[in-house]
């Protein structure tokens, strides 16, 4: 086992918060490992005056970090999963994720509480074509203007009156401790599906680095890792970029397995309900030999915990045509469900 880890990350305040959350998880399992943060300035950070779709897409937030990983200048990289393209460099892999935060978007406005309440021809600041497509679906009269920068700079632009409103991810607002209910209003999934992977912190490593793989196996939040598979499969099949309005959100239908131990959850994946029942029982008791108290009992119908429902959205390049689709699947076939949805929706958009 290694004694030190070099962790590559963007230099933004939110990226550093994400990195420290990963370090906290690593320290829980490997308290003696030294974690060195290696801040890296990316092309996406440097170019702030143009929409991402004009300069290469969200991959610009990863390019320099992934190159450092490939050059073995860092051992692992921390990303917001929403910034990770569906197709990655072959030697690299997302080997772990942290538990998903609430992935909803937030309507940020000083005077009004929803998109519907905005006055005629109001201006919303947003560079995301996904958000633009949903905004125009709700209120075709609204003007959507390019609005880039970190969370603080966008809120400052709003405060100075550059726009009437903006839309930001709840995750960022919460983690930066700037969510203010006086002017921040959550948007429900039924009105605006989140970006694929929104709310998830991802850890990327080299596939052949066994030491990092061992660490990732320990810190990986399995329920979230399985939950994002249909979303990521949808994204990968379409090879979508920042010019394509695309969204997806997955959730467990029958029960939330977030409190199951890793042992119990692995039995879900294997489909061994008898072993699952035993593992779940053990994970919810106090171990007499160690004195450790595990998670509180969770009422679960064993075998149903693996049912996932994913809502998908896909639009054409100008956002004038949008299609929606829902897939309900088992964990074992969730990736195939994402691909199936992509094929069906692509055909519908192209008609």
From Swiss-Prot:
Signal peptide: none annotated. Residues 257-306 form the RPE1 insert domain. Belongs to the HMBS family. This is Porphobilinogen deaminase. GO terms for biological process: protoporphyrinogen IX biosynthetic process. It is an enzyme of class 2 (transferase). The lineage of its organism: Bacteria, Pseudomonadati, Pseudomonadota, Alphaproteobacteria, Rickettsiales. The keyword Transferase applies. Monomer. Its EC number is 2.5.1.61. SUPFAM superfamilies: Periplasmic binding protein-like II (SSF53850), Porphobilinogen deaminase (hydroxymethylbilane synthase), C-terminal domain (SSF54782).
